[in-house]
Each structure stands twice: as structure tokens, then as C-alpha cells.
Amino acid sequence: MIKKLNKLIKNFTLNELRTGLKVTAKELVNKKITVQFPEERTPISPRFRGLHALRRYPNGEERCIACKLCEAVCPANAITIESKMRDDGTRRTTQYDIDLFKCIFCGFCEEACPVDAIVETQIFDYVFESRQGSIMTKERLLEVGSQNEQVINQTKFEDAKYK
């Protein structure tokens, strides 16, 4: 009987409504944690794995030696490499494609590369106009690498103490 009376009093006084309004009022005056994304950026870890890039040596030559270790270690089979022997006896890639829809951004390709040719940059805001746009060709990868070489070197330097 007393439980029913307590329940009736709580329902009559709208106790749950007051509790909810109290929580709402408290959150109204608290500091906002939302970031207005395109205008504001949050800090990114130096170990963040984003868009891929192929690097070049300072003399302009591609670093990739077509060893295909990155292709072999990729758990998602997102990397496709075709290579050809050059006149000087070295092997170079003729095709280096990464399907970003398949890629799980695990970083195994970067770890497997013996010459630091493939890296994952800190670029995370990119879009594709079509399904074909998700395939990063060798030319696009080299372009990303050339445009971001200074940032890549800086993040490699910051990350070196953890390896």
C-alpha cells in the first residue's frame, strides 16, 4: 500500500520530468565539446594512418624497388603491383594501385617496405567522385608523396622514437 502511495506521489509531482529537466539544464551551461570540423581541426597523432603516398629520393628517383612485400603482406589484397626490369638491372614498378575501398589502413604495407617507399600520411579528408576514384594509381600516389614530403619527413622523425 505504501509503495503504491509513493508511486502515485512521484507520478503526481512529475518526479521523472524534473530529473530530466535538471540534467538538461546542467548540460546547457557546461562547456561544449563539439568541433566545427572544416573550420576547426583537432590534433592528429603522429602515428595516424591516413591516405597512402609513394615517396621519391631527393634526386627525384622513385624509392619503390618493386619487391612486392607490401602486396604480399596486405591482408585485404588492396595493393596491385606490376614491375619491369630496367636496362641497368634494377626493377621498377609499371603499375602500383591501391584500392582504398578494400584497404583497412592497417599499416602493414608501410612496415614491410624496406626502403620507406609507401607511407600512410595524415590526410583523412578526401572524397571520390566515382568508384574508379577509389583506386589510387602510381601517379596519384607519387603526387600525394611529392606534395606532402615535408610533413611525411616530420612525422617519420616524430615516430622514430617509438620504433
UniProtKB/Swiss-Prot annotation:
The record's remark on the cofactor is: Binds 2 [4Fe-4S] clusters per subunit.
Instruction: Provide the alphabetized UniProt keywords.
Output: 4Fe-4S, Cell inner membrane, Cell membrane, Iron, Iron-sulfur, Membrane, Metal-binding, NAD, Quinone, Repeat, Translocase, Ubiquinone
Q: Which residues form a coiled coil?
A: none
Binding residues for [4Fe-4S] cluster 1: C64, C67, C70, C113
| The keyword Repeat belongs to this UniProt entry's keyword annotation | yes
The reply to whether Transmembrane helix figures as a keyword in the UniProt entry is no
Q: What is its EC number?
A: 7.1.1.-
Q: Where is the 4Fe-4S ferredoxin-type domain?
A: 54-84, 94-123
Q: Topology versus the membrane, per the UniProt entry?
A: Peripheral membrane protein
Question: What are the protein's GO molecular function terms?
Answer: 4 iron, 4 sulfur cluster binding; iron ion binding; NADH:ubiquinone reductase (non-electrogenic) activity; quinone binding
Known cofactor(s): [4Fe-4S] cluster
Q: Sorted alphabetically, which NCBIfam families does this protein's record hold? A: NuoI, PRK05888.1-4
**UniProt similarity note:** Belongs to the complex I 23 kDa subunit family.
Which purpose does this protein serve, as stated in its record?
Answer: NDH-1 shuttles electrons from NADH, via FMN and iron-sulfur (Fe-S) centers, to quinones in the respiratory chain. The immediate electron acceptor for the enzyme in this species is believed to be ubiquinone. Couples the redox reaction to proton translocation (for every two electrons transferred, four hydrogen ions are translocated across the cytoplasmic membrane), and thus conserves the redox energy in a proton gradient.
Subunit notes for this chain? NDH-1 is composed of 14 different subunits. Subunits NuoA, H, J, K, L, M, N constitute the membrane sector of the complex.
State the name under which the record lists this protein: NADH-quinone oxidoreductase subunit I
- The protein's gene is named nuoI
